[in-house]
Regions:
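Oxidoreductase and adenylate-handling cofactor-binding alpha/beta cores
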Residues: 90-92, 152-166
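Short acidic active-site motifs
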Residues: 35-37
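Glycine-rich phosphate-binding loop and adjoining beta1-alpha1-beta2 segment
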Residues: 1-20
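A conserved mid-domain beta-alpha-beta active-site/ligand-binding segment of alpha/beta enzyme cores
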Residues: 95-149
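ADP-ribose/adenylate-binding Rossmann-like module
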Residues: 46-89
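Conserved acidic residues
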Residues: 29-31
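Phosphate-binding loop/pocket of nucleotide- and phosphate-handling active sites
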Residues: 161-216
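A short, aliphatic-rich alpha-helical micro-motif
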Residues: 40-42
């Protein structure tokens, strides 16, 4: 409860300094925008995606800039009680080529982002409070178990990249681990969301995203 009501940025900065008091942090309280994205990525070796799910325009901008600068970009999404992981190599498939959200309205972009994040959808059958998720109101709470799994998978992947210790499969390869079902699934979606399997998945996802708040 010590951090209740405080900004996420200030809270995470304090946590990082508690772990390493000598850490050098550059904070961007105004957010990442076209005007400061180059400064944001200055001297970056690996980009770890920590943007909110609904910040898709900013995410697309940062991933595009990472590719332009030759920076590896990784994302790990907390889904249900698991994590879905993707790695975008500067020499491999791009974020845009994989997710293919250009030219679509907002809800369809969200649908395509979800489908691309987790082609396996291992978490689809155990959500007990579906009303907690509302894409119209931009609500999608995460469990702490999923967030901790994201941190573990991401930390290990960054270590492998920075130290050159073993290979890391890049998009269109993906990985989803679900602790609830105790399942690990590797996915391969050539052509990204243009893959026929993704078309079928999108047919399942679109109606879910159209749900509004429950009627009294």
């Amino acid at each position: 409860m010590a951090f209740m009501g405080q900004s996420k940025m200030d809270t995470l900065a304090r946590m990082a300094k508690d772990i390493n008091p000598e850490i050098n942090l550059r904070l961007f309280p105004q957010g990442v925008m076209p005007e400061n994205v180059d400064e944001f990525l200055n001297d970056v070796d690996v980009y770890v995606d920590g943007l909110d799910f609904f910040a898709l325009p900013a995410r697309r901008m940062v991933f595009a800039k990472c590719r332009e600068k030759g920076i590896p970009a990784l994302t790990a999404a907390p889904l249900g009680m698991g994590t879905a992981f993707l790695y975008f190599s500067p020499a491999g498939m791009s974020f845009e080529d994989y997710f293919k959200v250009e030219g679509y309205e907002q809800q369809e972009q969200y649908a395509r982002f979800i489908a691309g994040l987790s082609p396996a959808m291992l978490n689809r059958d155990y959500l007990v409070a579906p009303e907690a998720v509302n894409f119209i109101e931009k609500r999608g709470p995460s469990t702490i178990m999923a967030c901790d799994l994201c941190a573990g998978v991401m930390g290990t992947s960054v270590l492998k990249l920075l130290l050159g210790r073993g290979s890391l499969k890049a998009a269109p390869w993906g990985m989803h681990f679900d602790a609830y079902h105790q399942k690990l699934k590797s996915t391969w979606r050539p052509f990204g969301n243009s893959n026929p399997l993704q078309w079928l998945l999108l047919k399942f996802i679109r109606p879910v995203l159209q749900r509004g708040p429950p009627r009294g």
